[in-house]
Amino acid sequence: MNSKVNDIICTVSNLFHSKGYENTKLSEILAETGIGKGQFYHYFKSKRELGEAVIDHLIAEMTEELFVGILDQSLPPKVKLQKMLDTVLTLQMEHEGKRGCPIGNLAIELSEHDPLFREKLAHFFEQWEKKVQLMLDE
């Protein structure tokens, strides 16, 4: 993925986190990213395709931070649990607890309306649940 596409995805990820997917208009995406409509459609076929890229980005980010960075480490279960909770709390405190979880918000907003989004988001939460269960079984 080129850096411009990555920049767009990161910027829109913040927009979706603060406003939601449905409430974010294409005009806002264009204004925040500083690209024109033609450039947007060069990179993405639709807002939905961008939404999928944002979900993939958020899942990859959280997978790296929570799974690889904490739950897959050779640490005592109590330390893993504390690190995981600290990570989630830090994420919440970045926005004074006002925005919620970026992935959780998208899951609540989109799961009933889009099967692909629902599948991707559900898979992430299932993997997280399995990792926590394995940790608790240690």
Which residues fall in each region the model found?
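Generic hydrophobic, amphipathic alpha-helix propensity
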Residues: 4-12, 29, 54-58, 62, ...
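Amphipathic alpha-helical segments used for helix-helix packing
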Residues: 95-116
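Short coil/turn segments at alpha/beta junctions that flank glycine-rich nucleotide-binding fingerprints
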Residues: 18-22, 73, 99
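Hydrophobic alpha-helical connector segments
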Residues: 53, 68-98
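A surface-exposed regulatory interaction patch that couples sensing to output
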Residues: 97, 101, 120, 135-138
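Helix-turn-helix
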Residues: 7, 14-49, 53
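Hydrophobic alpha-helical bundle segments that form small-molecule/ligand-binding pockets
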Residues: 113-115, 125-138
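A general structural signal for well-ordered alpha-helical segments in protein cores
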Residues: 26, 47, 51, 81, ...
